[in-house]
Every structure is written in structure tokens, then in C-alpha cells.
């Protein structure tokens, strides 16, 4: 394995639940990163089996919050963590954790979707440029699920920053 992805909203569990701690301990032992899905999800659409069993489709998930991620990082300060979707609507909280912890990264997956849902709306270009300015390209990577490389190519970034985002950060983190 090169890493794991945690989608707490699908399982309805809190990422800082004590039962999850053995997962993070194993990731530390194996020296592999944990990619946390970040973003609000309608329980009905994110978990079809729950909706089929009568779950309220208008109830939003309250698991996988920045506060839970902070608890995990405080408990395991050396755990390699990636925040998917650059933290989505929790961007600034996740950015703060990535600034504080040397081993926290962000990916660029689905930024167009999450950026268009921000108030005020933010373009992918603006979002990536902001993150590079305040976090550094060494901690940002191309997202593996629905990201278009031309979005990064269009940013006002140096060749080194673009190289980091389009592969070098990932190569370093996953030891490829």
C-alpha cells in the first residue's frame, strides 16, 4: 500500500474516534499517508443505503470536521495527512493545520465544484495561487479524482511550483 483514503461521511464515523486510532498507528508504522475526504455531504446522496433505509436526505454529515482532524494531528503529529479538495469549505482551517504541521498536505481534486459553492465564489486559479502563496507548492498536489492539469498550467506560478503540483510533491510524499 502507498496510502489510505478515509471517507468518514460514508461510514458515519468520526475520524478522531478512539477506534480509528489503530488505523493511524498502522499508517505511521508503514510510513504511508492518510488522505482525508473533506467537505459537506448530504447524507442521502453520500450514503445511498442510509437513504434507502429512511434516512433524512436533508440531513448533512457532521463527521470529518476540521476539529476532528486537529485532534488526530495532535495525537499523531508525525502522521502524514492529505486534505482532499484543499479542505473544501473548510479551506482556511485546513490551510492553518497544513501551515502548523510539517507533514500535512492538500490536494486539488474537485476544486471547480467546491470553489463554485464558496461564498464568495473563488476560481480554481485564485484558490491554487492563494494556497501556493500561503502554504507553498511543496505541500500541494494534483488531485487524483477529477482535476484537470490545465487548471494548474493556467495559474501564475513558477515552473518549479507547477512541477510540484503536477507530480513532484506526490513523488516525494509517496516515495515514488
In which residue ranges do the predicted regions lie?
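Mid-to-C-terminal alpha-helical segments outside catalytic/metal-binding sites
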Residues: 130, 134-141, 146-176
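A generic structural motif
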Residues: 10-11, 108-113, 163-169
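Active-site micro-motifs of SAM-dependent methyltransferase domains
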Residues: 11, 88, 113, 148, ...
Amino acid at each position: 500500500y502507498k496510502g489510505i483514503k478515509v471517507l468518514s461521511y460514508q461510514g458515519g464515523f468520526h475520524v478522531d474516534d478512539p477506534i480509528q486510532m489503530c488505523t493511524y498507528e498502522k499508517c505511521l508504522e508503514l510510513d504511508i499517508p492518510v488522505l482525508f475526504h473533506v467537505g459537506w455531504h448530504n447524507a442521502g446522496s453520500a450514503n445511498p443505503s442510509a437513504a434507502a433505509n429512511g434516512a433524512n436526505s436533508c440531513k448533512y454529515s457532521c463527521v470529518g470536521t476540521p476539529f476532528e482532524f486537529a485532534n488526530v494531528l495532535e495525537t499523531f503529529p508525525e502522521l502524514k495527512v492529505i486534505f482532499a479538495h484543499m479542505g473544501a469549505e473548510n479551506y482556511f482551517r485546513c490551510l492553518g493545520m497544513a501551515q502548523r504541521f510539517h507533514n500535512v498536505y492538500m490536494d486539488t481534486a474537485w476544486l471547480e465544484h467546491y470553489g463554485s459553492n464558496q461564498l464568495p465564489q473563488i476560481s480554481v486559479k485564485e484558490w491554487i495561487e492563494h494556497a501556493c502563496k500561503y502554504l507553498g507548492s511543496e505541500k500541494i498536489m494534483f488531485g487524483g479524482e477529477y482535476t484537470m492539469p490545465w487548471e494548474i498550467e493556467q495559474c501564475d506560478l513558477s515552473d518549479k511550483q507547477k512541477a510540484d503540483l503536477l507530480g513532484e510533491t506526490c513523488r516525494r510524499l509517496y516515495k515514488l
